[in-house]
Amino acid sequence: DGLRRQRLDVPYVRENGKLRKASWSEALGTAAAALKGTKVLGLVGDLAPVEAAFSLKRMIESLGGSVECRTDGARLPAGNRSAYVGTAAIADLDTAKRIVLIGTNPRNEAPVLNARIRKAWLNGAAVTVVGPDADLTYDYTSAGADRAALKALVAAAEPVEGTVVIVGQGAITEADGTAVLAHAMALADKMGGKFLVL
């Protein structure tokens, strides 16, 4: 079963067709030598811990590989952490005065987050949506459903204390996803608010 029998608790290297125990430095050195000069690809799943993802990134870079941030085509810049993590915490929704949703239907994509948005709305927060109309369980103002509407919203934006801008994955997986992300970040900055990527 791997937990009680035959559990790997030390690294092994193959020598003359047989496995023998080795130190971590020897095992990693053997693996690095075997990978040297070959094309290497690493893929991290959505549920992998950040430490494992970071270790894989370092290994791929040390072997001369390049790092792609997403496999779904999302235009998230790997070099700008705030662009893919955001600057807002979920708890910021509890005190938000204005929430702007861009290219997302949180009722489908993140129901618990949608409940937090509803709670903020019940406490007086204004909600604006850039995207198709949907039943989100709270009232909102539609700014339009296209990129021109997003640009117009950014151009007209003024500082509003307690603003949280939320961008959905659907908005940044399209060909102009980088521009959408940049506009969303500019909107948050211009409104003096925080930014969150679903």
Each predicted region: which residue ranges?
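Structural alpha/beta core scaffold segments of enzyme domains
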Residues: 160-163
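A glycine-rich, hydrophobic/aromatic-adjacent loop/helix-cap motif
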Residues: 166-198
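N-terminal export/assembly segments and adjacent metallocofactor-ligating motifs
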Residues: 1-156, 169-170
